[in-house]
């Protein structure tokens, strides 16, 4: 029998030669991009790697990390802008990337109809969500201006976004030469440039948004308590999504504090030195890049090896093994006391939350296998809708849109960029559309929006459409009530543009269904719910932003208020604690024991909700306890304030527990009416008070004085009656206006400048009737005026005029007080009008005084030609007559009548 093995071997050789020949013919090396190398720009799914063009039909991917997706492909387009990537992009390879990659390397072949001259961008693309996980730019493409930017652009030549080419490949800020695993959730990356004298360090951790990542060098030759006198850099992501990296120096294991000009604790270098030329030189850490993606915080910064700051920074020998320290913990945001992000004690277990090791920067280390995978990958803001508060929909620039690529303009709800919107079944949701007439808002089942029929896809529209568009001056209202058949996941978008909105989560009924009333507290950052049943009240409060604790208080301000604080311990157990606060320091926060039932505290993606039920009037055996005075009267407006912070405890409170954000003013909650108003808004009753005071001090009382000064020439006692009527009417209106203000404010405090001037003016005005009743008698005809009468006349005039002057000043201080409460934009016009009125009054008085002096001169001239029996001559004089006294009604009776003289013939 013949042996067939030689023939089989020959066939295999021919087949291999044929495959090699065919491949060689298809994969030529004519493209100018051959050999082009670039690093992937990370946008989502922790994508990292190096891209290299091999030949005309393939490319190599090395050191490739990526979290898995649903239907991920290699994608191509001419540029990285939204329209090109979304509408003109296409699949360039048969390979699918649906699994997780861990430091992988492989060759990718292009489809037969794809050539390099058709590509400017190669992307890792998820088809169902039109998501760009990351991409590289080829030499004929530039980065789109609308691409996601998580930090200011780097000035480094080694890490520079933008155009890439063969001679200067793109260096991604997320790529490093070395990586060390510090814990399961924390990694250290670095790239050394010893020639230029610096090291680039990247800190990466699956940690909370308000947490810090710290790394630095321990004090040389230190063997114990390595944190003390260490030179560290504290990094993290701010609340607005942008990174920070600051030099810190540790003098004590405590939060930074400055007392009597001396800084102690974990403080920035700049705190130890004044912020001058010296202060600016001590912070030599340079932030290069930072982002927060998929629940992973990443910050890259540059540190010089030999720092000019020898006081707080240690020199680093790149070839020597030195002790370094690291930590993870909660960050304390800036507040009214300090302007820095300060780390709080990390706590936890060594090697998980903190640790130390020996590091030689020159050693090559690669301990990081695959990307970090966070349990909670979504940090987007959450808006929880209810039936009583409309959701304001506007359009604004894209800063942190969660699903790149995206258009340059996206939707905002209640001033938050593309938040996740949570609605409850059975609860109507009201939208106020103010995004412009080119943005038609709608709720759809399609992930991308923008009218799915244009992409040959079907969608179900649940609310809105082409007609739901509006502007600020003329908003369009849309009411949508999800029902039990509404799917759990929907999307809000513009019908004319894809990917402007984000997700709508539909859940079963919650707080809005459980409580009869709800209002937004100051700045719309906390929602307050309540239901009154019998002699008890059930209360709930929900924050609208992520925080470590949520506090609400009953009172005008935190001082002298009763506080309810919802927080979580280290085990994740929620608590609601009660306190009486009688000062501004931590020692002024006193725990109380209130009779609360149905207490709950929960957190959903960092949004805290607290609930409890308490009696309206506490039943106390010891009435001297503070909580016994914490009574709620449903018929009286309840003043409610709020605060949020990073960390709370039921133990000894310190400055680290201070709130990071708080209400600016209390809100008056009308418990029986189910409504609320800002405590400092101009109330109608106070508006009436202001008008009445202007009528009295600006018109009636000055008019009474002018009548006594310039109407003496009227025959009879007409001027006196006008004077009396105006003064009495003005004084009556002053008292009515005062009663209105006292009743509305439940009394008044003399701490206000307005109250001081107003009360002084009222006292002076009240002295005038008493002064008039005590006036001395007029001297007889021909007699000299007495000293008592003269003193009375002067005092009556001076007190009256002083009262009007002080009253006008009180009007202006009232306007200033109104501006402090409501903002200057509401008061500037009123101040201008009041000033104009005072100016016109001054001009009028000047004119009347000029006329009076002219009339007086004419009268004096006519007296030399006095005709006997001329009854038409008016001999009335000024307020002060020739005898130095004031003329009153008695003078008019005596001098205003006809004089009879009997003439007898001379003999």
Swiss-Prot record:
It is found in: Membrane. This is Cytochrome b561, DM13 and DOMON domain-containing protein At5g54830. May act as a catecholamine-responsive trans-membrane electron transporter. It comes from the Eukaryota. The keyword Transit peptide does not apply. DOMON domain could bind catecholamines and thereby could regulate the cytochrome b561 domain function. DOMON domain could bind one heme b. InterPro entries: B561A, Cyt_b561/ferric_Rdtase_TM, DM13_domain, DOH_DOMON, DOMON_domain. Residues 153-168 have a biased composition (Polar residues). Heme b 2 binds at residues 723, 796. The lineage of its organism: Eukaryota, Viridiplantae, Streptophyta, Embryophyta, Tracheophyta.
């Amino acid at each position: 029998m013949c042996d067939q093995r030689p023939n089989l071997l020959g066939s295999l050789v021919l087949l291999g030669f044929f495959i090699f020949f065919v491949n060689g013919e298809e994969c030529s090396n004519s493209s100018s991009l051959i050999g082009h190398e670039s690093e992937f720009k990370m946008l989502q799914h922790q994508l990292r790697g190096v891209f290299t063009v091999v030949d005309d039909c393939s490319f190599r991917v090395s050191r490739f990390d990526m979290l898995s997706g649903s239907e991920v492909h290699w994608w191509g387009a001419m540029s990285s802008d939204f329209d090109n990537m979304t509408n003109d992009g296409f699949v360039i390879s048969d390979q699918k990337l649906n699994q997780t990659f861990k430091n992988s390397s492989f060759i990718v072949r292009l489809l037969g109809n794809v050539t390099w001259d058709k590509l400017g961008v190669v992307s890792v693309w998820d088809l169902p969500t039109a998501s760009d996980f990351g991409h590289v730019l080829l030499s004929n493409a530039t980065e789109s201006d609308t691409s996601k930017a998580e930090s200011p652009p780097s000035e480094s030549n080694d890490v520079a976004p933008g155009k890439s080419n063969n001679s200067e490949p793109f260096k991604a800020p997320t790529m490093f030469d070395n990586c060390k695993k510090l814990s399961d959730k924390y990694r250290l990356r670095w790239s050394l440039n010893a020639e230029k004298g610096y090291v680039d360090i990247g800190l990466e951790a699956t940690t909370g948004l308000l947490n810090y990542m710290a790394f630095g060098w321990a004090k040389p030759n230190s063997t114990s308590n390595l944190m003390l006198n260490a030179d560290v850099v504290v990094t993290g992501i701010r609340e607005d999504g942008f990174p920070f990296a600051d030099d810190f120096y540790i003098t004590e294991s405590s939060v930074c504090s400055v007392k009597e000009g001396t800084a102690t604790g974990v403080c920035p270098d700049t705190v130890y030195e004044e912020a001058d030329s010296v202060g600016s030189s001590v912070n030599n850490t340079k932030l290069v890049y930072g982002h927060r993606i998929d629940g992973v915080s990443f910050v890259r910064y540059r540190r010089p090896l030999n720092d000019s700051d020898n006081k707080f920074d240690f020199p680093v020998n790149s070839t020597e093994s030195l002790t370094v320290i690291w930590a993870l913990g909660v960050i304390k945001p800036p507040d009214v006391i300090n302007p820095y992000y300060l780390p709080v004690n990390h706590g936890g277990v060594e090697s998980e939350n903190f640790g130390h090791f020996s590091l030689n920067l020159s050693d090559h280390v690669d301990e990081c296998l695959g990307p970090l995978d966070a349990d909670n990958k979504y940090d987007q803001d959450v808006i929880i809708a209810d039936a009583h508060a409309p959701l304001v929909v506007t359009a604004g620039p894209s800063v942190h849109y969660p699903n790149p690529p995206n258009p340059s303009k996206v939707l905002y709800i209640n001033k938050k960029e593309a938040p996740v919107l949570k609605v409850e079944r059975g609860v109507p949701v009201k939208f106020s559309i103010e995004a412009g007439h080119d943005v038609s808002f709608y709720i759809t089942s399609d992930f991308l929006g923008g009218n799915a029929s244009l992409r040959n896809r079907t969608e179900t529209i649940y609310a809105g459409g082409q007609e739901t568009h509006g502007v600020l001056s003329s908003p369009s209202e849309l009411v949508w009530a999800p029902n039990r058949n509404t799917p759990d996941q929907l999307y809000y978008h513009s019908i004319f543009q894809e990917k402007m909105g984000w997700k709508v989560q539909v859940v079963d009924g919650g707080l809005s269904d459980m409580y009869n009333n709800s209002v937004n507290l100051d700045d719309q950052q906390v929602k307050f719910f309540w239901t009154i049943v019998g002699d008890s009240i059930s209360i709930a409060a929900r924050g609208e932003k992520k925080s470590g604790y949520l506090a609400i208080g009953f009172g005008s301000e935190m001082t002298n208020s009763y506080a309810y604080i919802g927080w979580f311990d280290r085990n994740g157990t929620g608590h609601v604690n009660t306190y009486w606060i009688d000062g501004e320091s931590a020692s002024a926060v006193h725990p109380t024991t209130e009779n609360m039932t149905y207490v709950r505290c929960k957190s959903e993606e960092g949004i805290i909700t607290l609930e409890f039920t308490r009696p309206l009037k506490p039943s106390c055996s010891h009435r001297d306890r503070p909580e016994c005075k914490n009574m709620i009267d449903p018929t009286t407006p309840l003043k409610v304030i709020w605060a949020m912070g990073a960390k709370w405890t039921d133990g000894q409170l310190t400055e680290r527990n201070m709130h990071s954000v708080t209400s600016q003013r209390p809100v008056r909650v009308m418990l029986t009416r189910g409504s609320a108003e800002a405590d400092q808004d101009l109330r109608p009753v106070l508006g009436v008070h202001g008008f009445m005071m202007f009528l009295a001090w600006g018109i009636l009382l000055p008019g009474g004085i002018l009548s006594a000064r310039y109407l003496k020439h009227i025959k009879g006692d007409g001027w006196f009656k006008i004077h009396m009527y105006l003064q009495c009417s003005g004084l009556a209106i002053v008292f009515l206006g005062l009663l209105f203000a006292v009743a509305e404010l439940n009394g008044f405090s003399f701490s206000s400048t307005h109250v001081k001037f107003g009360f002084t003016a009222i006292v002076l005005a009240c002295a005038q009737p008493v002064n008039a009743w005590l006036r001395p008698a007029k001297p007889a005809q021909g007699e000299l005026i007495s000293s008592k009468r003269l003193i009375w006349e002067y005092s009556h005039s001076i007190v009256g005029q002083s009262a009007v002057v002080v009253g006008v000043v009180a009007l202006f201080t009232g306007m200033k007080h109104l501006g402090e409460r409501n903002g200057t934009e509401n008061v500037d016009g009123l101040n201008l009008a009041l000033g104009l009125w005072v100016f016109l009054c001054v001009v009028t008085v000047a004119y009347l005084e000029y006329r009076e002096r002219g009339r007086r001169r004419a009268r004096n001239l006519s007296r030399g030609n006095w005709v006997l029996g001329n009854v038409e001559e008016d001999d009335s004089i000024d307020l002060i007559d020739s005898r130095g006294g004031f003329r009153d009604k008695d003078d008019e009776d005596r001098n205003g009548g006809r004089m009879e003289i009997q003439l007898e013939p001379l003999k």
